[in-house]
Design a protein with these regions (language model features):
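Cyclic nucleotide-binding regulatory module and flanking cytosolic helices
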Residues: 1-29, 33-34
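Hydrophobic residues at beta-strand termini and immediately following loops
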Residues: 30-32, 81, 116
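Cyclic nucleotide-binding regulatory domains
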Residues: 37-108
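Short, flexible helix/strand-to-coil boundary loops that buttress conserved ligand/catalytic motifs
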Residues: 60-62, 93, 117, 125-128
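Phosphate-/nucleic-acid-contacting segments
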Residues: 79, 153-167
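A small-molecule sensor/coupling module
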Residues: 101-102, 119-159
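A short hydrophobic beta-strand segment most commonly corresponding to one strand
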Residues: 111-120
Length: 167
C-alpha cells in the first residue's frame, strides 16, 4: 500500500508522511475475493479497514419476526462503496472492546484492504499524542457525518411510517 494513497483517507487528514508511516507499518494487506462476506454482523470487532481497491456492500439484517415464529433472515443493503471514495469502516471497534459489528460487509468485486488492528492504532495514538489528537479528531468528524446521515434516514423512515399509519 502506497503512503500517498493512505494519505488520501480522511482518518489521516492533516498528517504528514512520517506520521502516516507509523500506521502503515502496522497495517496488513488483505485480498478478498468477489462475493465473500469478510465482516459479519454480530461478530466482535477488533480492527478497522481501509478499502484500497474494489467495491463493497454494507448490509444489515432485517430480523423481522414472522407469523410462523421464525426470523426473516433477509438483509438490507445500506450502502455500496467504491475504493475511489477512500472509505474506512469498522471504526466503532476502536471504542469498545466488546463491541459487536453492527453490519456485514461483502466484497462486490475482488477487493484489496488495509487492516489496522484497534490496539495498534490506539497504541500509536498513546505513544504520539499529537498524532493521536489529529487521528481522533478525524474519526470524530467521520462519526459525526455518519450520525447526521443516520438521523436524516430515521426522520425519513419515521415520516413514511407516520404517513402509512394515517391512511
Amino acid at each position: 500500500m502506497d503512503i500517498n494513497e493512505l494519505k488520501q483517507f480522511q482518518i489521516f487528514n492533516k498528517l504528514d508522511e512520517n506520521e502516516v508511516k507509523k500506521f502503515q507499518k502496522k497495517m496488513k494487506n488483505i485480498n478478498v475475493p468477489e462475493g465473500q462476506n469478510f465482516i459479519v454482523e454480530g461478530d466482535i470487532g477488533d480492527s478497522i479497514y481501509l478499502l484500497l481497491e474494489g467495491q463493497i456492500r454494507i448490509n444489515q439484517a432485517l430480523t423481522l419476526s414472522m407469523h410462523t415464529g421464525g426470523l426473516d433472515n433477509r438483509e438490507k443493503a445500506i450502502i455500496n462503496l467504491s475504493a475511489n471514495v477512500k472509505p474506512l469502516f469498522g471504526e466503532m471497534s476502536l471504542f469498545d472492546k466488546d463491541d459487536r459489528r453492527n453490519a456485514s460487509v461483502k466484497a462486490i468485486t475482488e477487493c484489496e484492504l488495509a487492516q489496522l488492528m484497534s490496539d495498534d492504532l490506539l497504541a500509536i495514538c498513546d505513544e504520539f499524542p499529537d498524532i493521536g489528537y489529529k487521528v481522533m479528531k478525524n474519526l470524530a468528524k467521520i462519526l459525526c457525518k455518519r450520525l447526521v446521515e443516520t438521523n436524516q434516514n430515521v426522520l425519513k423512515l419515521t415520516t413514511a411510517f407516520s404517513l402509512v399509519l394515517e391512511r
